[in-house]
Amino acid sequence: MKVLVYFQPNRKYDNYEGARMRKTIKGALEVVGATHTSNIYDDYDIAHFMSPEDESKMSIALERGVPVIVSALFGEDDPSARFLSHKSKDGKRTTTLRNRALKMLNKATLVLVPTESAKKFLIESGVETPIETCIPGINLARFNFSREDEKELFYRYFREDKNKKIVLAVGEYDNNLEGIHAFINVATKRDDTVFYYVGSETTNLNNGRAKTIIKDAPKNVHFKNILPDDIYRSLLLNADVFMLPGYNLAGIISVEEAMAAKCQLIVRKSSVFPELVKNEKTAYIAQFSETLTSLCLDYLDGEIKPTIQEANEQVSEHSLQKFGDQLVNIYNSLIKNK
């Protein structure tokens, strides 16, 4: 069996969640001995896509008569892998499936999503294609704490004081940076901690409220665009806290990596699937910014217990071997029944 694993974003997004998902799928297939290609014009038995932007490429695979799988809702912080759109008006936030995404998903043979709540959302949004849950695996070896050289990369790259704690947040740079003050307000009270916000620049930050927020942030807060993969991983390995201050659904890939890197998760309720993390067991979850800020401060002060070990044990169950076996079983079933 040969699998087309296709995701080819704009180069500046080729270190982000979609690219990391592509790497995970390829790695899982290699672990279980399955062959893969990224050439749409190659010979293959089944095709696996990850982005609504690739609908035209998916049509090429469909014309060849091969089954087509689409993985959805795993990398929502990545503009190149995003299936959802979000709007905020008069204090009310709505999340909908993008029209292009709906069209693509309804052309596929099968849709894979990480959780049952994701499946329910797609069905309610008009997806008629069969949907199965399959949480992405993770290469646990990439988060090996015995590799001091991996951890050292962050300090060589950013020249930070090793005695300071680190809080990492991920999201996107929209016009308002909604929810960001839950992150910034922690920084105003912690001179002994450095804060990094990493995201994709989807709007022009030279104008609007986001520019003002970034300009007025404390000096211990650093806003970064997408980082090289090894630098980002090193940042994760050194971070004490992984925070999701935004309101929009975050990428499950980023959450799994933070769990593997043994960061303490402090996340907004709307940013994660309810099945992925459990409050006070594998993460601290809050709805309001004030609570997120308070939780982060309490954790840094040692006033609430870590949930790191439980989270790491949970994500350790999602190995590349297990993910690869699941994918191959799904692929074989579709090929057999085509």
Predicted stretch roles:
Residues 279-290, 297-303:
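Conserved acidic donor-binding segment of nucleotide-sugar-dependent glycosyltransferases
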Residues 76, 91-111:
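Membrane-proximal helix-turn-helix segments that form the acceptor-binding/catalytic region
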Residues 264-267:
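Short hydrophobic beta-strand element within catalytic cores of glycosyltransferases
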Residues 170, 194-210, 225:
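Glycosyltransferase donor-sugar binding loop
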Residues 247:
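Aromatic "clamp/platform" in nucleotide-sugar-dependent glycosyltransferases that forms part
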Residues 160-178, 184-187:
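Conserved donor-binding/catalytic core segment of Leloir-type glycosyltransferases
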Residues 104-130, 138-142:
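A short, active-site helix/loop in glycosyltransferases that binds the activated sugar's phosphate group
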Residues 208-230:
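Nucleotide-activated donor-binding/catalytic signature segment of Leloir-type glycosyltransferases, i.e.
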